[in-house]
Regions:
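Hydrophobic transmembrane alpha-helices and their immediate loop junctions
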Residues: 1-200
Length: 200
């Protein structure tokens, strides 16, 4: 059955799509940033400026989520676990793996690259923040990159929690799988990570 949603574009043969629920969270995050975070932290700008940076920051945040999922997908494709679709939805993003990894090493490689990518994006956005601030451009634009730096680091740390199906849970599953040679390790990971893992 074809997943419901809107197809946007393809990257390396992988279809990027949005679920209809994503529109709701996009509007909520844009409004929260435009009417709450940026005016509170950086007062004195016009409403139009807050709206602009709020929408731009939200788009770049979700671009970061797509990049995180693309990292998973490209590594999975290279390891023979085909991914043909990534969907953004109300709780974030999801790469649609055609099947589960065939061995513990593949499991860990596919899982760990996501948080590493988010950390790299956090560092990149922090450098952008320093460049914008040093160039004498409006502080509000430096604030956008500062927000994106922190949110990407937070995304990486959250995904490293040992709760399935977070990346940390998959890494732990791979470690248990490698150590025991037992494919039933995921059940133990779910028990270990249950308190830490909300629906994502």
């Amino acid at each position: 059955m074809r997943p419901k949603g809107i197809d946007l574009f393809k990257v390396a043969g992988i279809q990027i799509a949005i679920d209809y629920s994503w529109i709701v969270i996009f509007l909520l995050v844009s409004w929260s940033l435009s009417a709450g975070y940026f005016p509170h932290e950086y007062p004195g700008y016009a409403w139009g400026a807050y709206l602009t940076v709020g929408v731009v920051a939200t788009l770049l945040f979700f671009a970061s989520v797509v990049t995180h999922e693309l990292a998973h997908s490209l590594v999975a494709n290279r390891l023979g676990q085909p991914v043909r679709r990534i969907t953004l939805f109300i709780f974030g993003g999801m790469a649609h793996l055609s099947r589960e990894p065939s061995n513990a090493t593949a499991e860990m490689k596919i899982a760990v690259v996501g948080p590493l990518t988010s950390l790299a994006l956090g560092a990149l956005f922090w450098v952008c923040k320093r460049i914008v601030a040093g160039a004498g451009l409006p502080l509000l634009w430096a604030a956008v990159f500062k927000y994106l730096a922190f949110i990407n680091v937070a995304l990486a740390l959250f995904n490293l929690l040992p709760g399935f199906p977070l990346d940390g849970g998959r890494i732990l599953r791979g470690l248990l799988w490698r150590r025991s040679g037992d494919l039933r390790a995921p059940r133990r990971v779910r028990r270990i990570g249950e308190p830490a893992s909300p629906s994502v």
